[in-house]
Amino acid sequence: VHDAWPDKHLLFTEGCQECGTHLGSWAVGERYARSIIADLNNWTEGWIDWNLLLDETGGPNHVSNFCSAPLIVETARGAVHTLNSWHYIGHFSRFLRPGSRRVLCATTRDDLHATAALNPDGSL
């Protein structure tokens, strides 16, 4: 898309983990990280989760495609569970500041995913 329309801003939207809430699963955060890194390395300027907060069933939802979210609320108790995907998103948000520009980054291992950006203040 970037090659065809380099003047357009690309956003990844509606990221989520399907099939329930996945409480305690590190796989969800790892999946988010791989997706965010791959998208940033391919001209995406932003990454947006579909739902930041859902209830303990992965809803509410009108079509029964229940999902996980970075924050899960137990409605009866009012308890909020912070899933690892919340912390993964927070990690990227902390280091990739508004106005940052992605810079070339490479690894020598196929199982190591990486991205890098130059922030407006000069930090990497």
Where are these regions (language model features)?
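Substrate-binding/catalytic groove segments of enzymes
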Residues: 97-103
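Membrane-embedded translocation segments of transport machinery
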Residues: 1-8, 18
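Carbohydrate-binding surface patches
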Residues: 94, 105-124
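Loop/turn elements at helix/coil->beta-strand transitions in domains of secreted/extracellular proteins
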Residues: 5-10, 42-47, 98, 121-124
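Aromatic/acidic polysaccharide-binding cleft in carbohydrate-active enzymes
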Residues: 12-91, 103-107
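Generic recognition of flexible, low-complexity loop/linker segments
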Residues: 1, 34-37, 112-116
